[in-house]
A protein has these predicted regions:
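Cytosolic juxtamembrane helix and N-cap/initiation of the first transmembrane helix
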Residues: 1-47, 162
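Hydrophobic alpha-helical transmembrane segments of integral membrane proteins
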Residues: 100-137
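Juxtamembrane helix-break-helix junctions at the cytosolic face
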Residues: 85-104
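Hydrophobic, membrane-facing alpha-helical anchors
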Residues: 57-62, 79-90
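Residues within membrane-spanning alpha-helices of integral membrane proteins
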Residues: 19-33, 74, 78-81, 85, ...
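Transmembrane-helix signature of multi-pass solute transporters
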Residues: 35, 115-119, 142
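Hydrophobic transmembrane helix segments
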Residues: 29-74
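Membrane-water interface at the C-terminal end of transmembrane alpha helices
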Residues: 139-162
Length: 162
């Protein structure tokens, strides 16, 4: 695990100077996403209660066993943490591959992320979740903007970047 984290740090935080800001922002997005997923696990009961109340299921008719299943389902978000770590590390590794297809992959991923978090901000949920989603959206928007800069585009095109 330490080798994995060391490689992620080396490939993202200390990437080529042309894409170093992108790597650092992607690592920041990964950390925020993981903290959000862990907080969701820790606060699974309050999140589940909020959603059940919002959907009208919290009128006392729901048996305790059904509520336990809902709480358990929210607790499974720990799987999200693992998938986020591996997903972001996969994308950070793409920074070292200088090809237009890698640039398109990173660009489409960041634009999709901005769109997804923009949608999630307007869905009913607890206020703290919207704050975290807004932070994630801003980070991914910054990644997308950086990927459009001439220096980063030249890097992925294989040209020399000063």
């Amino acid at each position: 695990m330490s080798e994995f984290l060391h490689r992620l740090y080396r490939q993202g935080w200390h990437a080529d100077p042309a894409v170093r800001p992108v790597g650092r922002l992607m690592i920041a997005a990964m950390v925020v996403s993981c903290l959000y997923a862990l907080a969701s696990v820790a606060l699974a009961k309050s999140l589940a209660d909020f959603q059940m109340h919002r959907q009208g299921m919290d009128d006392g008719s729901l048996p305790a066993s059904a509520k336990a299943i809902v709480y358990g389902a929210y607790s499974l978000r720990v799987i999200t943490v693992v998938s986020l770590i591996f997903g972001y590390s996969y994308l950070v590794q793409r920074l070292s591959r200088r090809s237009p297809s890698e640039h398109r992959l990173l660009l489409s991923w960041s634009i999709f992320g901005v769109a997804a978090y923009s949608y999630l901000i307007f869905t009913p949920n607890l206020p703290w979740t919207h704050v975290v989603q807004a932070i994630q959206m801003v980070i991914l928007l910054a990644v997308a903007v950086l990927l459009f800069t001439p220096r980063v585009r030249a890097y992925f095109a294989g040209a020399s970047v000063d």
